[in-house]
UniProtKB/Swiss-Prot annotation:
The active site is at Y151. GO terms for biological process: alcohol metabolic process. Disulfide bonds: none annotated. Its EC number is 1.1.1.1. GO terms for cellular component: cytoplasm. This is Alcohol dehydrogenase. The keyword Oxidoreductase applies. It is an enzyme of class 1 (oxidoreductase). It catalyses: a primary alcohol + NAD(+) = an aldehyde + NADH + H(+); a secondary alcohol + NAD(+) = a ketone + NADH + H(+). One of its GO terms (molecular function) is alcohol dehydrogenase (NAD+) activity. Pfam families: adh_short. CDD domains: ADH_SDR_c_like. The gene is Adh. Substrate binds at S138.
Length: 254
């Protein structure tokens, strides 16, 4: 996918990985970048606008845990304004295994609902033009961090949802792939709670392992966007971008 002159919606585009990715996207010259985030950050929006004045940056407050109908209403507002959208990035995520329901709601259900909502505008069975969805999942969807089983399970669920949608591309006309960062130096991983406090030092122990910067992750994220490979399971770890070959142990045969 060519980012230049495209219209992009980025859910949670002002967070750690999100903000650096927004910066890299803006440098590539899209026509519009629409940022949906729970928390407004006027300074970050101003920075993005200054980075490339030719790009129109728009912000809408959005909590991914709202009902599906509210998400559809917001997307209708955006589509009415832009007419077309080329790429949806689902990037909302929390890491706190003491908040079980919210972890699942943000990391999994929010991704499902936002993706489902945009199908009203993209699905070729409804006369839509198709589009592209990039879901930010996690390497914990491959192998869990067992001290945070709720977080790991939510990301595994998001990954499974994403790979399923990719197999429906011939029906919907929508390309779908996953972005799976490894341990990245963000606020998210500097302090978080394990499930039932099984490991009070989990964040500290995790950061003893090799990490990557948010900039390294963002630069590889843009490469994955440009590759635009339906069904790709991208691992973004230690400053590298690698396509993961999923081992199949069972097949529905459908």
């Amino acid at each position: 996918m060519v980012i230049a002159n495209s219209n992009i919606i980025f859910v949670a585009g002002l967070g750690g990985i999100g903000l650096d990715t927004s910066r890299e996207i803006v440098k590539s010259g899209p026509k519009n970048l629409v940022v949906l985030d729970r928390i407004d950050n006027p300074a970050a929006i101003a920075e993005l606008k200054a980075l490339n004045p030719k790009v129109t940056i728009t912000f809408y407050p959005y909590d991914v845990t709202v009902p599906l109908a509210e998400t559809k209403k917001l997307l209708k507002t955006i589509f009415d304004k832009l007419k077309t959208v080329d790429l949806l990035i689902n990037g909302a995520g929390i890491l706190d295994d003491t908040q079980i329901e919210r972890t699942i709601a943000v990391n999994f259900t929010g991704t499902v609902n936002t993706t489902t909502a945009i199908m009203d505008f993209w699905d070729k069975r409804k006369g839509g033009p198709g589009g592209v969805v990039a879901n930010i999942c996690s390497v914990t969807g491959f192998n869990s961090i067992y001290q945070v089983p709720v977080y790991s399970a939510s990301k595994a669920a998001a990954l499974s949802f994403t790979t399923s949608l990719a197999k429906l591309a011939h029906i919907t006309g929508v390309t779908v792939y996953s972005i799976n960062p490894g341990i990245t130096k963000t606020v998210l991983v500097h302090k978080f709670n394990s499930w039932l406090n099984v490991e009070p030092r989990v964040a500290e122990l995790l950061l003893e392992h090799p990490t990557q910067t948010t900039l390294q992750c963002a630069q590889n994220f843009v490469k994955a966007i440009e590759a635009n490979q339906n069904g790709a399971i991208w691992k973004l770890d230690l400053g590298r971008l690698d396509a993961i070959e999923w081992t199949k142990h069972w097949d529905s045969g459908i």
